[in-house]
């Protein structure tokens, strides 16, 4: 199983090639250079954030596409799409990271085959909890729960992380506003 999208290729000292717009390329180039040069937190905080990013998504309009199909016959390649999505405003207890590597785990597969339930129902319920949570009730859902990358922005309630921190993200859910802010 896999989804392939035009990739930005980068190797230190080798320059950049793109499969996306020049503006996006410049955005990623600046992040990669900051990492490579050991930039401090202030330099990461000063980076301009792109208005959109490329993401693997499932679509609300397709959540019934596997109705009546046995689980073993549901093919995630049919439901996962790669598209540009708006970069969200971060909530006080959230961080914005530039993902440098990600993986597929059981949550990704379940989301892509809409089992055991469609995540769109859970996101709609979450949206009723607060104005910040409402931002997640969209016509698409960005999938993925395991990643590594670098922190670009932190919400006002985040205390243990700062722009420039290199992090690993896992699928357990912890609040960034909690006493123990967990990112592995």
What is the meaning of each model-derived region?
Residues 1-27, 31:
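C-terminal glycine/acidic-rich active-site capping loop/insertion
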Residues 57-59, 113, 151:
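Residue-level signal for short segments within beta-strands and strand-turn junctions
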Residues 49-56:
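Short structural boundary motif marking the start of a folded domain
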Residues 56-57, 168:
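Residues in well-ordered beta-strands of folded domains
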Residues 179-184:
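Short, compositionally biased
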Residues 86-103, 117-177:
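Glycine-rich beta-strand-centered segment in the early N-terminal region that forms part
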Residues 34-46, 63-101, 106, 140-142, ...:
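A short N-terminal beta-strand-loop micro-motif at the entrance of redox/enzyme domains
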Residues 107-111:
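Cytochrome P450 core scaffold surrounding the K-helix E-X-X-R motif
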């Amino acid at each position: 199983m896999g989804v392939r999208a035009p990739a930005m290729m980068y190797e230190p000292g080798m320059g950049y090639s793109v499969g996306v717009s020049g503006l996006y390329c410049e955005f990623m180039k600046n992040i990669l250079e900051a990492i490579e040069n050991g930039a401090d937190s202030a330099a990461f905080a000063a980076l301009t954030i792109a208005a959109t990013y490329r993401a693997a998504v499932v679509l609300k309009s397709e959540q019934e596409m596997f109705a009546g199909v046995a689980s073993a016959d549901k093919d995630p390649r049919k439901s996962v799409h790669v598209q540009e999505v708006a970069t969200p405003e971060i909530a006080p207890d959230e961080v914005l990271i530039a993902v440098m590597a990600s993986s597929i785990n059981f949550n990704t597969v379940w989301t892509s085959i809409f089992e055991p339930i469609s995540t769109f129902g859970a996101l709609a319920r979450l949206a009723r909890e607060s104005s910040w949570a409402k931002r997640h009730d969209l016509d698409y859902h960005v999938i993925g729960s395991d990643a590594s990358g670098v922190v670009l922005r932190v919400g006002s309630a985040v205390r243990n992380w700062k722009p420039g921190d290199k992090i690993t993200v896992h699928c357990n859910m912890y609040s960034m506003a909690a006493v123990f802010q967990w990112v592995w």
